[in-house]
Amino acid sequence: MTHGDDRGLRLPPRLAPHQVVIVPIARDDDRAGILETAAAVAEELRATGVRVRIDDRAEHRPGFKFNEWELKGVPVRIEIGSRDLAAGAVTVVRRDTGAKQQVAVPGAAAVIGEMLDAVQASLFASAVEERERRTLRDPRGYDEMIEFLRGAGGFVEAPWCGRAECEERVKEQSSATIRCLPLDEHSAPPGGACICCGRPAVTTAVWAQAY
């Protein structure tokens, strides 16, 4: 899975239903102050357009909540405990890297906003890197294309004539079909030949197996 690891999802902030989750770690003697800080930070984040949730469920321990929100892929987790409260700060954890830092409450929204941008950029870069690693462009011939699709799997970008017969031939021999037609610099150059039949290509197609 592109946006996942052994602990669950790693959702890009722009797609995540909750971009930030705040987990108060409160004992009876400081519970009111911690919940007040959580509410203030949440309000500041919402004012900047961040989708945030406070997980103040009393029936679950903090460790359970950490694991649950990691599984669901929430990009940033904020922890607020007694030490954070005393320091006038919160502890912020990135889902993608696990990096943890303490951030002062005044101006926390700006720091967390920058962190969300960094998470978005990091996940996008890793997704592009993974796609490139698993993509065969301009195979030397039809046999190489079929061997690649039958093997470890991935994507093949190759010129296509536009005929359904060619797509069906590839499907019969590799179970792969055309997933999309790129509209960028990878479009078929003038004079290119179809990878399947050798006829003039009309476009570049991306072939892959569906799962």
Which residues does each predicted region cover?
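NTP/phosphate- and nucleic-acid-binding module
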Residues: M1-Y211
